[in-house]
Amino acid sequence: MNNTNSNKKKLWPEQREVLLRALKARFGKNMNRHKGLEWAKVQAKLDPPAGGEKLWSLNEMERTGGEPDVVVPIAIGNDKKTGECIFYDCSAESPKGRRSVCYDHEALELRKEHKLDNNAIDMAAAMGIELLSEEQYRELQKLENFDTKTSSWIITPPGIRKLGGALFCDRRYNHVFVYHNGAESYYAAKAFRGLLRV
């Protein structure tokens, strides 16, 4: 699932089928994440032509280790007004293919040594997904225990970012914690989780 269709945000038919099989299987194994929702309703939103770029973004989430799945907690589930389904990165730990990145491009440019290849904000934008907010991260953690060994960057309020900081979260001691770092920092056990509205 690594190669896209002529570098466009489209998948080849065989890539699409492999991805949909993986998504359907994960959906069926984790019904606690989306009680009352049927896979057929989700797949209908992913069918061409509307699902083209969305499938590409889901494939990027999958390719980088996010294990995307539809999540329907009370506060952040299907949008009743728009009828959207929302896919979240549901890997047990922060996605392996997105680790060792700083927070954003400004932070990347400030690094004098150990230049990094990417940053969380730009990487998410290139994938067509959104970083989780603190509220969204906490709601996700109500479903299962995520990030017990890793941590994930989250959207940082402008006032904190203006002063050079950035926020990240994890779960330790059966509690969800929010921390701060310099935005230019990076760690092998820190990545980011995203969401995709379909």
Regions found by a protein language model. Give the residues of each.
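A binding-site-centric feature that preferentially detects glycan-recognition modules on secreted/surface proteins
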Residues: 2-130, 134-198
